[in-house]
UniProtKB/Swiss-Prot annotation:
Role description: Non-catalytic component of the 20S core proteasome complex involved in the proteolytic degradation of most intracellular proteins. This complex plays numerous essential roles within the cell by associating with different regulatory particles. Associated with two 19S regulatory particles, forms the 26S proteasome and thus participates in the ATP-dependent degradation of ubiquitinated proteins.
Tissue and organ distribution: Detected in liver (at protein level).
Maturation-removed propeptide residues: 1-45
Record note on quaternary structure: The 26S proteasome consists of a 20S proteasome core and two 19S regulatory subunits. The 20S proteasome core is a barrel-shaped complex made of 28 subunits that are arranged in four stacked rings. The two outer rings are each formed by seven alpha subunits, and the two inner rings are formed by seven beta subunits. The proteolytic activity is exerted by three beta-subunits PSMB5, PSMB6 and PSMB7. Forms a ternary complex with SMAD1 and OAZ1 before PSMB4 is incorporated into the 20S proteasome. Interacts with PRPF19.
Main location: cytoplasm
Listed GO CC annotations: ciliary basal body; cytosol; mitochondrion; nucleoplasm; proteasome core complex; proteasome core complex, beta-subunit complex
Pfam families: Proteasome (PF00227)
Provenance organism: Mus musculus (Mouse)
Name of the protein: Proteasome subunit beta type-4
Induction: Up-regulated in liver tumor tissues (at protein level).
Modified residues (Phosphotyrosine): 102
Family stated for the protein in its record: Belongs to the peptidase T1B family.
Length: 264
C-alpha cells in the first residue's frame, strides 16, 4: 500500500495544488504558459481596409439635397471594382453616401435597412427623419471608435423633411456637423473650395444649378484624384422622395495632357 501511495505521489509531483489549475510548461513548439500569456487585445479586423471608395459630395438646394459618388472600389491603388454603389436610399426622406471601407459600408447598410424595417412594422405612420439617422450614425460611429474597432467610413447624409433640407457629415471617430455643402476624402481639398465659391456668391441654388455644380466637381475629381473614376451616381432627395441616377459619366477633355510634365 505504501508503495502504491509513493507511486501516486511521484505521478502527481509538480502538479497543481488543490483548487489550482495545471500550468502547462513552455515547450519548443511555442506553447505558452497561460499565466504569462498577454491579455487579448481589441478586435482589429477593420484596421486595414481592403476595398475603399473615395470622395462623396453633397450640396443643398432650394427644396432638397443632391449627393454624388463615383462607383469605383479600389483595392489599394488597383481600380478593382468599377460598378459598385456607394449611395444608399435609407427611406423616402433620407439618403447617404459613404467613402472609406466598402465592407463596413455594407455592414451599415444592413443595420440601417433592418432599423427601417423594424420602424415600418410598428405601423404608426412615423419614420426616421434625416436628422435622426444622422444622430444615430454619430452615436454608432463613436461607440465603435471607443471600442477600438471603428467602422472605417466617412458619410454624408442628405434628406428633406418638414419643408427643410438637411445635409450632415459623420466620420469614423463620430465627429459630426451640418453644412450647406460637404465633401469627403480627396474631395475635401479639391471639390469643397469649388462648392463654397459658388455658394458664397449664391447661397440658394436651384435643383438644376446644384446638379450642374456637382457634375463639374465630379469631373475635376476624375482629372485630379487618382482613386476616382468616371462612372458615378447622383442622388436627389426632395419632397417627392429619393431618386438615384446612374451610372453616369462626365464629358472629359485630355487635349492638354501632353503639356503637363514633372510628375513622371
Amino acid at each position: 500500500m505504501e508503495a502504491f501511495w509513493e507511486s501516486r505521489a511521484g505521478h502527481w509531483a509538480g502538479g497543481p495544488a488543490p483548487g489550482q489549475f495545471y500550468r502547462i510548461p513552455a515547450t519548443p513548439s511555442g506553447l505558452m504558459d497561460p499565466a504569462s500569456a498577454p491579455c487579448e487585445g481589441p478586435i482589429t479586423r477593420t484596421q486595414n481596409p481592403m476595398v475603399t471608395g473615395t470622395s462623396v459630395l453633397g450640396v443643398k438646394f432650394d427644396g432638397g439635397v443632391v449627393i454624388a459618388a463615383d462607383m469605383l472600389g479600389s483595392y489599394g491603388s488597383l481600380a478593382r471594382f468599377r460598378n459598385i454603389s456607394r449611395i444608399m436610399r435609407v427611406n423616402d426622406s433620407t439618403m447617404l453616401g459613404a467613402s472609406g471601407d466598402y465592407a463596413d459600408f455594407q455592414y451599415l447598410k444592413q443595420v440601417l435597412g433592418q432599423m427601417v424595417i423594424d420602424e415600418e412594422l410598428l405601423g404608426d405612420g412615423h419614420s426616421y427623419s434625416p436628422r435622426a439617422i444622422h444622430s444615430w450614425l454619430t452615436r454608432a460611429m463613436y461607440s465603435r471608435r471607443s471600442k477600438m474597432n471603428p467602422l472605417w467610413n466617412t458619410m454624408v447624409i442628405g434628406g428633406y423633411a418638414d419643408g427643410e433640407s438637411f445635409l450632415g457629415y459623420v466620420d469614423m471617430l463620430g465627429v459630426a456637423y451640418e453644412a450647406p455643402s460637404l465633401a469627403t476624402g480627396y474631395g475635401a481639398y479639391l471639390a469643397q473650395p469649388l462648392l463654397r465659391e459658388v455658394l458664397e456668391k449664391q447661397p440658394v441654388l436651384s435643383q438644376t444649378e446644384a446638379r450642374e455644380l456637382v457634375e463639374r466637381c465630379m469631373r475635376v475629381l476624375y482629372y485630379r484624384d487618382a482613386r476616382s473614376y468616371n462612372r458615378f451616381q447622383i442622388a436627389t432627395v426632395t419632397e417627392k422622395g429619393v431618386e438615384i441616377e446612374g451610372p453616369l459619366s462626365a464629358q472629359t477633355n485630355w487635349d492638354i495632357a501632353h503639356m503637363i510634365s514633372g510628375f513622371e
